[in-house]
Design a protein with these regions (language model features):
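Short beta-strand->loop micro-motif that forms the acidic, two-metal-ion catalytic signature
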Residues: 133-147
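A structural signal for short, well-ordered beta-strand segments
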Residues: 87, 137, 176-182
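Catalytic-core segments of nucleotide cyclases and related cyclic-nucleotide turnover enzymes
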Residues: 181, 187-212
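N-terminal alpha-helical interaction blocks
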Residues: 1-23
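Long C-terminal interaction/binding lobes of large macromolecular proteins
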Residues: 19, 29, 148, 240, ...
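Juxtacatalytic helix/coil linker segments
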Residues: 21-129, 133
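Alpha-helical scaffold within the catalytic cores of cyclic-nucleotide enzymes
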Residues: 112-127, 144-178, 203-212
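Cytosolic regulatory/linker segments at or just downstream of nucleotide-handling modules
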Residues: 217-260
């Protein structure tokens, strides 16, 4: 078999079409037991899980549904590919004012609770936590990991975040706003040496960040692209035409809150 160009290899890996992964999925699938790495199918529990941990295939800190080998492989082969993904941003609203009313240790505990809740919900919907930044989180929903319905997963995760933070009711334990967008993005490893990181870059990521900045507490702004790709039922939802910082064209988005 001819050697794939790096970009084509990345594209196949990110979309779930890499032949080597298919072989690994069959091989690891013969070992018990679930849960498993969503990419290579390595078992994380049972006898197979013991073996995987011994050879450093255990769950990755990046996401407990990815194994360390898959993450290391991504870092070992720098590069990436442009594919369609869905991106979710979630930010704490009024964090400066909240911090002013609390001791530093109390605020740190509150943010740790938020990060934990965000990571769990994102993981439950097969997203990958790209990073925690200040008072927010960024998640990527990639076809090879989240499936072809990655947009629906991103929307469901955003709704789950409202629920887990109490923003589906009148008294959230921490106020958050979120944004979801779907589009083409460069996904892969960037940087040099030990500073190399797996991430997504491009207008899709930037647009999601700008949407999130305009979402009020308890709101999710979902771009029409994400809504269409995710099969969102927009009956009764408010539609906003937004001017996003740094973009020449307006962006239309649907508003979802805890009661919708």
């Amino acid at each position: 078999m001819a050697k794939l160009a790096p970009e084509e290899m990345w594209k196949q890996m990110l979309t779930g079409n890499y032949p080597r992964l298919h072989g690994m999925r069959r091989m690891w699938g013969a070992l018990p037991s679930p849960p498993r790495c969503k990419l290579c199918n390595a078992p994380f529990r049972g006898p197979g899980g013991v073996l995987m941990r011994a050879i450093r295939y255990g769950p990755s800190p990046l996401n407990r549904r990815l194994c360390k080998w898959c993450i290391r492989s991504a870092h070992k082969h720098p590069g990436g590919a442009e594919i369609e993904i869905s991106v979710l941003f979630v930010d704490v609203r009024g964090s400066t004012a909240i911090a002013e009313k609390m001791l530093s240790e109390e605020f740190s505990g509150l943010m740790s609770r938020f990060y934990g809740a965000a990571a769990q919900v994102i993981d439950d919907w097969d997203g990958i936590v790209d990073k925690f930044v200040g008072d927010g989180a960024v998640a990527l929903f990639i076809p090879g990991f989240a499936g072809s319905d990655h947009a629906a997963g991103a929307i469901a995760a955003a709704r789950g975040l409202l629920e887990q933070t109490g923003n589906d009711g009148p008294e959230p334990w921490i106020p958050v706003g979120a944004g979801v967008h779907t589009g083409k993005s460069f996904v892969g490893t960037v940087g040099e040496g030990d500073a190399r990181d797996f991430t997504a870059l491009g207008d899709t990521v930037n647009t999601t960040a700008r949407l999130t900045a305009l979402a009020g507490a308890g709101e999710i702004l979902i771009s029409t692209e994400a809504a269409t790709a995710g099969g969102l039922d927009t009956t009764g939802l408010e539609r906003r035409t937004l001017e996003l910082r740094g973009k020449d064209q307006t962006v239309d988005a649907w508003v979802v809150n805890g009661s919708s």
